């Protein structure tokens, strides 16, 4: 299984670790991140609506994220839910890879991918209860099989 190591928000840390960086709307602008990171570095950018997606499509980023697709408990003040129909509509606005994020579970991941997302980003449904090594390995294998 291949995985991409992505640093959230901090292009400087990503550069030092030779990792990818994911930037939000209130972080360092993608053009500034691209100036300090290696040209081949992967940069992603969060969007939450059509206007942000259109603007993000003009940025020097390798992928765009859109969400939250569903209600999420991972953010204190989440943006309004995008939903599957809006995801399907927004997919047509960019040729860049589109990562769906927000409230995605094993039960909903397939429908999110079918709606046009190229990838899903998951926080809450990633960790099993209890979070033992064997349970985490089994959960990871479930996610890998869903996303193939």
Regions found by a protein language model. Name each.
Residues 16-18, 23-25, 44-94, 130-131, ...:
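Glycine/Thr-rich beta-alpha phosphate-binding loop at enzyme active sites
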Residues 5-19, 48-62, 93-100, 104-122, ...:
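Catalytic cores of alpha/beta
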Residues 25-33, 65-78, 109-146:
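Glycine-rich phosphate-binding active-site loops on the catalytic face of alpha/beta enzymes
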Residues 1-6, 28-48, 77-106, 139-148:
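Alpha-helix-loop-beta-strand connector modules within alpha/beta enzyme cores
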């Amino acid at each position: 299984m291949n995985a991409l190591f992505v640093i959230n928000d901090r292009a400087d840390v990503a550069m030092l670790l030779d990792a990818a960086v994911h930037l939000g709307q209130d972080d360092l602008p993608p053009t500034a991140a691209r100036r300090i990171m290696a040209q081949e570095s992967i940069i992603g950018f969060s969007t939450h609506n059509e206007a942000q997606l259109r603007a993000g499509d003009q940025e020097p980023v390798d992928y765009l994220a859109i969400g939250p697709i569903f209600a999420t408990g991972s953010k204190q003040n989440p943006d309004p839910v995008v939903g599957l129909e809006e995801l399907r509509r927004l997919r047509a606005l960019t040729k860049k890879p589109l990562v769906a994020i927000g409230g995605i579970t094993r039960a909903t991941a397939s429908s999110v991918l079918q709606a046009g997302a190229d990838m899903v980003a998951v926080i809450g449904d990633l960790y099993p209860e209890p979070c033992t090594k064997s349970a985490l390995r089994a959960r990871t294998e479930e996610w890998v099989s869903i996303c193939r």
